Amino acid sequence: MNTAFILLAQYNGIVIIPLERVCRDYFSHLTPEKLKLKIASGDIDLPLVAIEKSQKAARGVHLNDLATYLDAQHQKAKMEHEKLMGRGSGQSP
């Protein structure tokens, strides 16, 4: 399964997804402003794209960056699950 293709379909071909939509779809526990702060502080490893240099410019997330982030979160969850099941630390079950 290719996450980028799924996102492309989900967002109808939009390459730069508005921050508000990313927040609503994947970070619903945060406000867009809180998401922006977490990204700026490095708590969430997701590059923000500004359409122009103005501080008031719309910000969004490139589809490929969102796909990479989601895939990384998936890998972390799988590794945690493997550890929980006793399979990920080199131990025999």
What do these predicted ranges mean?
Residues 3-34, 69:
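Polyanion-binding surface elements
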Residues 2, 25-60, 83-90:
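Major-groove DNA-recognition helix of helix-turn-helix-type DNA-binding domains
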Residues 18, 47, 62-65:
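Helix N-cap / beta->alpha transition motif
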Residues 1-2, 75:
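Short, structured coil/loop segments at alpha-helix boundaries
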Residues 14-15, 59-61:
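Residue-level marker of intrinsically disordered, low-complexity segments enriched
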Residues 62-91:
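A short, Lys/Arg-enriched interface patch at domain edges and termini
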Residues 5-9, 45, 77, 81:
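Generic hydrophobic, helix-prone segments enriched in Leu/Val/Ile
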